[in-house]
């Protein structure tokens, strides 16, 4: 029999006793009274705060959204199968948050930041970013002055978007809203390749899982997933997950913005978020307002979209920004931006409904897409007459501003005369000239899906259209002319395109563009 060594026994006992703490850990615990439809009423959490994360004994988490006299209303962030009446719930004493780091780029995550793409855990250092956060104050912002190139001719020319802007994309279903936003993400590859990436976040709210998978595949095939994160709350996910998905996307965007980098976020779409929020609010027995939406649905969207901003260039001031997360304070840099492209779906073109008017009033402009244009083959189907960018004009590059200055007015005039021309064929030469030029410009502004144009190519072809250099080219041959024209400039006059990209429109550049257009259009003369 082995001998017991008293010294060894006492050493083990001392080691165990040294780690003993007499302090008791106190958790504030409540009890589930009722549960159903993704909502639990909990008794006993007297000190719970609004928006706090609570944990059920099954491990499921929820967010406190209703504080009543004797109970709290908790929305569940997952299926309620394992939660029963009298289950225990404990406070976590922290606000709902998401862990963000460089490793989240190129991944598909859910509302809580958990990866759902089957590629394993998110690697590298992460920082805790709250889902709900106050927008930067006035002194931490600066005006929008840098362009965010979308690669879409009609947007970059007539409804320009700047870094830090909120530009609404609005239209009926199946008019190409998502395509406009995905093309904008694809166009940022040019900057990623140049070592100046614009980090993109695509938030899919209430969409089919197959649609999200198709978008992820498109981004991957085009090499755009290398700088993009997808946040997905699918149609099958609980309503609270759909409500908070845009906030999770905004938190990821703020990580890049606050570390001094440009980011772009697409909310696809906020109509579905509003519907999910209405569902949650009605289940919490909040009084319904217009169209049965709760009274604070405007605040839901305004507090989300106000988080998009161009942060001041001064690092010292940026470090003092209000509501900075503790985890990020040492990493803060000035000069970052978060640009938002929220999408709203209208019913039969009714832009005066409740949610569309709310979001129009919050954003810095809107891009209207119409079914009529889409069905007539004008794609992207942007109605330039009612689309506007309130702050993007200051961000447009100088060469584009000079070239496209009158384009919007010309096209509006063309649409008016085109409608008038339907009533009679006896038109004066001036009117015929405007209609002829307008038709060719419409062809120039057409663009294929997932085919963004570099800004210098846009300026070159729009210059030819706005100066009426295509008058000898038949309308059906305009796209063919465009291909030849841009290919010729790219091979023979690359320096001209580079000058345009730098924002300069010199006499020499104008001569080259004019001469090239005249030479190429001559072969189309009858």
UniProtKB/Swiss-Prot annotation:
Main localization category: membrane
Keyword ATP-binding attached: yes
SUPFAM superfamilies (alphabetical): C-terminal domain of alpha and beta subunits of F1 ATP synthase (SSF47917), N-terminal domain of alpha and beta subunits of F1 ATP synthase (SSF50615), P-loop containing nucleoside triphosphate hydrolases (SSF52540)
Top-level taxon: Bacteria
EC number: 7.1.2.2
A single Gene Ontology CC term: proton-transporting ATP synthase complex
A Pfam family reported for this protein in Swiss-Prot or TrEMBL: ATP-synt_ab
GO molecular function terms attached to this record: ADP binding; ATP binding; proton-transporting ATP synthase activity, rotational mechanism
Keywords assigned by UniProt, alphabetized: ATP synthesis, ATP-binding, Cell membrane, CF(1), Hydrogen ion transport, Ion transport, Membrane, Nucleotide-binding, Translocase, Transport
Binding site for ATP: 171-178
Catalysed conversion reaction: ATP + H2O + 4 H(+)(in) = ADP + phosphate + 5 H(+)(out)
NCBIfam families on file: atpA, PRK13343.1
Oligomer status and interactors: F-type ATPases have 2 components, CF(1) - the catalytic core - and CF(0) - the membrane proton channel. CF(1) has five subunits: alpha(3), beta(3), gamma(1), delta(1), epsilon(1). CF(0) has three main subunits: a(1), b(2) and c(9-12). The alpha and beta chains form an alternating ring which encloses part of the gamma chain. CF(1) is attached to CF(0) by a central stalk formed by the gamma and epsilon chains, while a peripheral stalk is formed by the delta and b chains.
PANTHER family: ATP SYNTHASE SUBUNIT ALPHA, MITOCHONDRIAL
The family this protein is said to belong to: Belongs to the ATPase alpha/beta chains family.
Entry protein name: ATP synthase subunit alpha
Record organism: Christiangramia forsetii (strain DSM 17595 / CGMCC 1.15422 / KT0803) (Gramella forsetii)
Lineage of the species this protein comes from: Bacteria, Pseudomonadati, Bacteroidota, Flavobacteriia, Flavobacteriales
């Amino acid at each position: 029999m082995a001998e017991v060594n008293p010294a060894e026994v006492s050493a083990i006992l001392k080691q165990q006793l040294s780690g003993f703490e007499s302090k008791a850990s106190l958790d504030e615990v409540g009890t589930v009274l009722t549960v159903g439809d993704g909502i639990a009423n909990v008794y006993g959490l007297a000190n719970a705060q609004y928006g706090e994360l609570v944990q059920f004994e099954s491990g499921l988490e929820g967010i406190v959204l209703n504080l009543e006299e004797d109970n709290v209303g908790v929305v569940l962030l997952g299926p309620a199968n394992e939660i029963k009446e009298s289950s225990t719930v404990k406070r976590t004493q922290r606000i709902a948050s998401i862990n963000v780091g460089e490793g989240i780029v190129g991944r598909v995550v859910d509302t809580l930041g958990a990866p759902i793409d089957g590629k394993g855990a998110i690697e590298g250092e992460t920082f805790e970013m709250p889902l709900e956060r106050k927008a930067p104050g006035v002194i931490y912002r600066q005006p929008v002055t840098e362009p965010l190139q979308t690669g879409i001719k009609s947007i970059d020319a007539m409804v320009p978007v700047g870094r830090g802007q909120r530009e609404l994309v609005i239209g009926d279903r199946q008019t190409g809203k998502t395509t406009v936003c995905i093309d904008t993400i694809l166009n940022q590859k040019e900057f990623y390749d140049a070592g100046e990436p614009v980090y993109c976040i695509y938030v899919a709210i209430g969409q089919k899982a197959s649609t999200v998978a198709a978008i992820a595949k498109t981004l991957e095939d085009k090499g755009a997933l290398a700088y993009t994160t997808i946040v997905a709350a699918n149609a099958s996910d609980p309503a609270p997950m759909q409500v908070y998905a845009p906030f999770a996307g905004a938190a990821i965007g703020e990580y890049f913005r606050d570390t001094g980098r440009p980011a772009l976020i697409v909310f696809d779409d906020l109509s579905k978020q509003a519907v999910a929020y209405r569902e949650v609010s009605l289940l919490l027995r909040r009084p319904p307002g217009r169209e049965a939406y709760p009274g604070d649905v405007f605040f839901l969207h305004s507090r989300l979209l106000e988080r998009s901003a161009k942060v001041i260039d001064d690092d010292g001031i940026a470090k003092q920004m209000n509501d900075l997360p503790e985890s990020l304070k040492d990493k803060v840099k000035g000069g970052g931006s978060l640009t938002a492209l929220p999408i709203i779906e209208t019913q039969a073109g009714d832009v005066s409904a409740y949610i569309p008017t709310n979001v129009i009033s919050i954003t810095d402009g809107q891009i209207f897409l119409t079914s009529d244009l889409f069905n007539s083959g004008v794609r992207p189907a942007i109605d330039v007459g009612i689309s506007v960018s309130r702050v993007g004009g200051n961000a447009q590059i100088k060469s584009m501003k000079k070239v496209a200055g009158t384009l919007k007015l010309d096209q509006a005039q063309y649409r008016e005369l085109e409608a008038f021309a339907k009533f009679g064929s006896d038109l004066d030469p001036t009117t015929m000239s405007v209609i002829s030029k307008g038709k060719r410009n419409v062809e120039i502004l057409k663009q294929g899906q997932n085919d963004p144009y570099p800004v210098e190519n846009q300026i070159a072809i729009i210059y030819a259209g706005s100066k009426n250099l295509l008058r000898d080219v038949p309308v059906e041959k305009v796209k063919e002319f465009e291909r030849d024209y841009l290919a010729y400039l790219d091979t023979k006059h690359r320096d001209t395109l580079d000058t345009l990209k730098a924002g300069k429109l010199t006499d020499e550049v104008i001569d080259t563009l004019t001469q090239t257009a005249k030479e190429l259009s001559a072969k189309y003369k009858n």
